Amino acid sequence: MGRSLKKGPFADHHLLAKVDKLNESGEKQVIKTWSRRSTIFPEFMGHTFGVHDGRKHVPVFVTEDMVGHKLGEFAPTRTYKGHGSDKKTKR
């Protein structure tokens, strides 16, 4: 179930402040964040976020198609190595 429309989209205040500061100065640097729950706003376009996946910060470059999604959607937390192979068929 999605978020109520009357509440509007959510993004952490510290994240918005960092993006506004970088937009004013015109700098491009990686913004480290643990806020996977924040919605991507149009102001975030062109910036690279280091989204924490529980172990490291995954670089996520924000494009126009990502607006409206959450930052955590683009930094997977689980690594799938495949199912174990059947040892009987190897003989």
From Swiss-Prot:
<dbReference type="GO" id="GO:0006412">
    <property type="term" value="P:translation"/>
</dbReference>
<keyword id="KW-0689">Ribosomal protein</keyword>
<keyword id="KW-0694">RNA-binding</keyword>
<keyword id="KW-0687">Ribonucleoprotein</keyword>
<comment type="similarity">
    <text>Belongs to the universal ribosomal protein uS19 family.</text>
</comment>
<dbReference type="Pfam" id="PF00203">
    <property type="entry name" value="Ribosomal_S19"/>
</dbReference>
<dbReference type="InterPro" id="IPR020934">
    <property type="entry name" value="Ribosomal_uS19_CS"/>
</dbReference>
<comment type="function">
    <text>Protein S19 forms a complex with S13 that binds strongly to the 16S ribosomal RNA.</text>
</comment>
<dbReference type="InterPro" id="IPR023575">
    <property type="entry name" value="Ribosomal_uS19_SF"/>
</dbReference>
<protein>
    <recommendedName>
        <fullName>Small ribosomal subunit protein uS19</fullName>
    </recommendedName>
</protein>
<dbReference type="GO" id="GO:0000028">
    <property type="term" value="P:ribosomal small subunit assembly"/>
</dbReference>
<keyword id="KW-0699">rRNA-binding</keyword>
<dbReference type="GO" id="GO:0003735">
    <property type="term" value="F:structural constituent of ribosome"/>
</dbReference>
<dbReference type="InterPro" id="IPR005732">
    <property type="entry name" value="Ribosomal_uS19_bac-type"/>
</dbReference>
<dbReference type="GO" id="GO:0019843">
    <property type="term" value="F:rRNA binding"/>
</dbReference>
<dbReference type="GO" id="GO:0005737">
    <property type="term" value="C:cytoplasm"/>
</dbReference>
<dbReference type="GO" id="GO:0015935">
    <property type="term" value="C:small ribosomal subunit"/>
</dbReference>
<dbReference type="InterPro" id="IPR002222">
    <property type="entry name" value="Ribosomal_uS19"/>
</dbReference>
